[in-house]
């Protein structure tokens, strides 16, 4: 597998509560736009479901379509992600949805992770194969 690394920034974040739970806990939906730089360059559009807990932590899952270039190859692909927020840091794991690659990225397979401290972005690592 080939490894890619880089950074991402949050370009837009639209989040709304759809269910209030006991105390400060709640369920929300977020529509987020990301910008990517490094071995992966482009833009991602994500929709996620989140569960915030009373203790200030959260868990989330979502889908993100990324359009851009990976190692100089152009196209798009979809990621399925899960993650958790605790101690001021969001840690996310994701995998490429099989069959979602387009253009030069058709046949893309792989998985990765990202870390973001409270702020506008973070870093990612991505291990992939192009079949």
List PLM regions with ranges.
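Targeting-peptide/extracellular-domain and disordered-appendage signature
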Residues: 1-131
């Amino acid at each position: 597998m080939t490894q890619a690394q880089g950074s991402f920034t949050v370009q837009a974040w639209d989040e709304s509560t759809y269910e209030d739970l006991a105390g400060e806990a709640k369920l929300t939906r977020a529509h987020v736009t990301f910008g990517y730089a490094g071995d992966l360059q482009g833009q991602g559009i994500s929709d996620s479901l989140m569960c915030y807990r009373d203790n200030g932590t959260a868990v989330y899952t979502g889908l993100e379509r990324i359009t851009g270039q990976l190692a100089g190859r152009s196209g798009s692909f979809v990621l399925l992600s899960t993650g958790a927020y605790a101690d001021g840091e969001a840690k996310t794991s994701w995998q490429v949805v099989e069959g979602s690659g387009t253009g030069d990225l058709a046949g893309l397979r792989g998985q990765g992770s990202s870390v973001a401290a409270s702020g506008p972005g973070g870093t990612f690592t991505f291990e992939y194969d192009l079949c």
